[in-house]
A protein has these predicted regions:
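Short acidic-glycine-tyrosine-enriched beta hairpin
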Residues: 75-94
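A short, N-terminal "cap"/entry segment at the start of jelly-roll beta-barrel domains
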Residues: 1-53, 130-132
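A generic structural motif
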Residues: 70-74, 98
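Ligand-binding loop in jelly-roll beta-barrel domains
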Residues: 92-118
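Short, conserved beta-strand element in jelly-roll/cupin
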Residues: 54-71
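Residues that act as N-cap/strand-start positions at coil-to-secondary-structure junctions
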Residues: 19-21, 55-56, 83, 91
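Glycine- and charge-enriched low-complexity intrinsically disordered segments
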Residues: 121-132
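A short, polar/proline- and glycine-enriched secondary-structure boundary/capping micro-motif
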Residues: 46-48, 81-84, 116-120
């Protein structure tokens, strides 16, 4: 059975997403992707360009060790949600994430959905044309 400290998860998903490996560590355990993100302030809106609706299609279940992140649901009447240090959260697909300050976040995500998202981010970061 896999066991790891968040900071010891493989960088960039063990080489699957090398460009994203700077602040993202993850491993696939069964049908979940266990991810650990460390980032400064970041509005992820531009990262979702090319995805359906310009929003993240992956649901996220997480815990905030440090910092604060907001989840915005563009084009809906859903209210903005905020998760701060010590909070657990669930953000369904169809969102945009905004990290308001330096943050450390652990997430458990459906592996198939996260792989699609991370592959998109890698293509975007490399300058390749994102796939729909």
């Amino acid at each position: 059975m896999p066991v790891s400290k968040p900071s010891e998860l493989p960088k960039g998903g063990g080489g699957r997403w090398p460009i994203c490996g700077v602040g993202f560590r993850s491993a696939q355990w069964g049908d979940l992707e266990v991810g650990y993100t460390t980032t400064g302030p970041l509005d992820c809106t531009p990262l979702y360009a090319g995805l359906p609706g310009g929003v993240c299609q992956c649901p996220h279940y997480g815990y905030v060790f440090k910092g604060r992140l907001r989840c915005v649901y563009p084009g809906t009447e859903w209210p903005e949600e905020v998760a701060e240090a010590g909070d657990v959260y669930f953000f369904p697909a169809g969102h945009v994430l905004v990290y308001d300050e330096d943050s450390e976040v652990l997430e458990l995500n459906p592996a198939a959905a996260l792989v699609k998202l991370m592959d998109h981010l890698e293509r975007l970061a490399s300058g390749a044309t994102p796939e729909p």
